[in-house]
Amino acid sequence: QPQWKLFLKWGWLSFAVFVLMAPVFYTMYISFNELGFGAKYYIFTFQWYENVFSDKQLINALGWTMLLALITLPIVIPFGLLSAKLYKQSTQKVWIVFVLLSPLFVPADILGSALLVFFKNLNKFFTFISEHTGIYMFETWFDLGIMSAVIGLIVYTLPYVFVVIMITMARYRPEQPEAARDLGASAWRAFWEIEFPQIRAGVFSACAFVVILTFNEYTRTSLLKGGFDTFTSVLISQMLN
């Protein structure tokens, strides 16, 4: 490929990324302005960052949000990967896409409320079982808290993980791991050494998506989180007050 074509391609890609990221760069720029957003003059300061890192409530909420992301990641990524593999091998692709993407078409408040009612009724059921059997193992499993918030995040993020990995899987041919199996490789080795290197970018992109969506999520998590605050909920409450 001619050098000028390669230079033109990377130049265009860099320009597109710059245009997409320009609002983020501008926000970072004004975050160091002592006079705040929209001011006529610019005075450099770290004041706003000092305020953020000295806010114990905000830092605590940041920790809870990171915990939610770290718990959700190792659950939703394998589910998304297996769903994408099922889509790749199945002849009923339309139904798989319909089922996996259906949470995206349900408004956040309706989906969050439905999950809230579901967990409340499920908790009542296990409480009833506990009272009549004396087995209290599952009594508090579905109280509002970390577990309910994580389940809500899994329902919300799984469609995105599925789509990202599915698009990446379009690049490789399923005959390759099958050939490795025929040559004596185990299923895990065929996946890890042949399939995963080709879809690695999609898996890592899906991980980044999950973390970003966890920080961005407000409505569903607010209904399901129970007694702790997330980063977004604290930010919104501080802005409203």
Residue map of PLM features:
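Transmembrane-helix boundary motif in ABC transporter permease subunits
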Residues: Q1, K5-L6, L70-L101, S113, ...
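Interhelical loop and adjacent transmembrane-helix boundary motif
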Residues: P2-Q3, G36, Y49-Q57, F215-N241
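Periplasmic/extracellular loop-to-transmembrane helix junction in inner-membrane transport proteins
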Residues: K5, F32-T72, L240-N241
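Hydrophobic positions within alpha-helical transmembrane segments of bacterial inner-membrane proteins
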Residues: A22-V24, A69, L73-K85, D109, ...
